[in-house]
Amino acid sequence: MAFKRKFTPKRKFCRFCADKNLPLDYKRPDILKDFVTERGKIIARRITGTCAKHQRRLTTEIKRSRQMALMHYTTVHSTDVKKKSI
């Protein structure tokens, strides 16, 4: 007897391939934060659904945005620092 799936998983797709007008740029942290966990780790492409080409570029742009101080390295740490200084 073969195992039959109860449901078919939803097909993941690359947001950047689907929408050519969506800019992948370090100056847009509002888009980049969707691909970073609350701990500051970059989410794997098997979870986000991005293609290999855009995942590489996404990683580069997130790191560049962090260097330019447009994004935090970790969001949890940044809120703890604010609480201690008050």
UniProtKB/Swiss-Prot annotation:
GO terms for biological process: translation. Keywords: Ribonucleoprotein, Ribosomal protein, RNA-binding, rRNA-binding. Signal peptide: none annotated. InterPro entries: Ribosomal_bS18, Ribosomal_bS18_CS, Ribosomal_bS18_sf. GO terms for cellular component: cytosolic small ribosomal subunit. One of its GO terms (molecular function) is small ribosomal subunit rRNA binding. Pfam families: Ribosomal_S18. The keyword Ribonucleoprotein applies. Binds as a heterodimer with protein bS6 to the central domain of the 16S rRNA, where it helps stabilize the platform of the 30S subunit. Part of the 30S ribosomal subunit. Forms a tight heterodimer with protein bS6. Belongs to the bacterial ribosomal protein bS18 family. This is Small ribosomal subunit protein bS18. It comes from Maridesulfovibrio salexigens (strain ATCC 14822 / DSM 2638 / NCIMB 8403 / VKM B-1763) (Desulfovibrio salexigens). The lineage of its organism: Bacteria, Pseudomonadati, Thermodesulfobacteriota, Desulfovibrionia, Desulfovibrionales. The gene is rpsR.
